[in-house]
Every structure is written in structure tokens, then in C-alpha cells.
């Protein structure tokens, strides 16, 4: 018979494993010496974009990652680590932790998983500086409308010139 504590740990590992497997974005970060008030501020920022930040015991995180396609992350789970898990958002949690880490030097991005691919801290930093989807669409629409505006302006000038010549 399995002890209740062990059963609870097994349940937690399988729950975390499932969350990691289904997530669009998972970020592992170190937060030693971060005041609780700052950690709660990060938690509130992430909650606004439907993401969660969780602290699990190291062995539970290691076992959960071992049972996924991300076994390479197990060796990085030394020290005090936390996870950001996002089921919907892809870049927003990356931007939040990137900006938070810039403000709080004790927070260090260790690694992550973005769209089922393990990414390094450098790749996470690169992704954080990308414009959002809305900004990209706005830039695309401006780029597509610019030639039309120029054509309309040229046609207007041409019609005004012809009107003054007649």
C-alpha cells in the first residue's frame, strides 16, 4: 500500500507533467533572495495574462520534466527555481519575466520551453524583445497601405495638375 504522502507526490508529479506537456510556454527561473512582495507582484502580473507561476520542490519538478520530452532541463533545476506556465499566451509571459528580471537582478531566467522546443536564456531574451502580434499586424498593414497612399497622392496631384492646365 502506498503511503498518503507518496501518493500525493505522485499525483503532483503527474499533474505538473500534464501541465508542462500541454503548455505553450514554460519558463524556469531562479529567484533566490527575492522578497515575497516582489514575487507576489510577479504573480499578479502573470495572472493578468492567464499565466501562473508556481514553486514546486526540486525533486517534483525533476520527475515531471523526466516524464516529458524535456529531460535536458532536469540538470538545470539546481537551486531555488520556479516555473511560469502558460496554456494560451506564447510571448506575453516571456516579456513579463524578462522585464521583471531587468528590474530585479536576483531573478535569472534559466531556460524554458516555447512551442514544444527547449530554449536557452538568450533565446528567451530575443523573444522578449520581439513586438507583439498586434504590433506586427499594425506594421504589416502600414507597410501594405503605404504604396496605396502614395498612388492616391500621385493621382490626386495628377488630377489637380490636369485641372489647372484646362
Curated annotation (Swiss-Prot):
Record family assignment: Belongs to the universal ribosomal protein uL10 family.
Gene assigned in the entry: rplJ
Pfam families (alphabetical): Ribosomal_L10 (PF00466)
Entry's Gene Ontology cellular component terms: ribonucleoprotein complex; ribosome
HAMAP family referenced in this protein's UniProt entry, alphabetically: Ribosomal_uL10 (MF_00362)
Taxonomic superkingdom: Bacteria
Any one GO biological process: translation
Quaternary organization: Part of the ribosomal stalk of the 50S ribosomal subunit. The N-terminus interacts with L11 and the large rRNA to form the base of the stalk. The C-terminus forms an elongated spine to which L12 dimers bind in a sequential fashion forming a multimeric L10(L12)X complex.
GO molecular function ontology, one term from the record: large ribosomal subunit rRNA binding
Function: Forms part of the ribosomal stalk, playing a central role in the interaction of the ribosome with GTP-bound translation factors.
PANTHER family reported in the protein's UniProt record: 39S RIBOSOMAL PROTEIN L10, MITOCHONDRIAL (PTHR11560)
Name of the featured protein: Large ribosomal subunit protein uL10
Keywords in alphabetical order: Ribonucleoprotein, Ribosomal protein, RNA-binding, rRNA-binding
Keyword Cytoplasm: no
Amino acid at each position: 500500500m502506498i503511503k498518503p504522502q507518496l501518493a500525493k507526490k505522485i499525483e503532483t508529479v503527474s499533474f505538473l507533467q500534464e501541465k508542462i506537456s500541454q503548455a505553450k510556454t514554460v519558463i524556469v527561473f531562479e529567484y533566490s533572495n527575492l522578497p515575497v512582495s516582489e514575487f507576489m507582484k510577479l504573480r499578479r502580473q502573470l495572472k493578468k495574462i492567464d499565466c501562473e507561476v508556481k514553486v514546486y520542490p526540486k525533486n517534483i519538478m525533476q520527475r515531471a520534466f523526466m516524464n516529458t520530452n524535456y529531460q535536458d532541463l532536469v540538470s538545470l533545476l539546481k537551486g531555488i527555481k520556479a516555473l511560469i506556465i502558460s496554456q494560451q499566451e506564447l510571448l506575453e509571459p516571456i516579456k513579463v519575466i524578462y522585464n521583471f528580471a531587468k528590474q530585479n537582478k536576483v531573478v535569472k531566467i534559466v531556460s524554458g520551453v516555447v512551442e514544444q522546443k527547449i530554449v536557452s536564456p538568450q533565446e528567451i531574451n530575443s523573444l522578449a524583445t520581439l513586438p507583439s502580434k498586434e504590433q506586427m499586424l499594425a506594421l504589416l498593414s502600414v507597410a501594405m497601405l503605404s504604396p496605396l497612399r502614395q498612388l492616391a497622392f500621385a493621382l490626386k496631384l495628377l488630377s489637380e495638375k490636369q485641372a489647372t492646365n484646362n
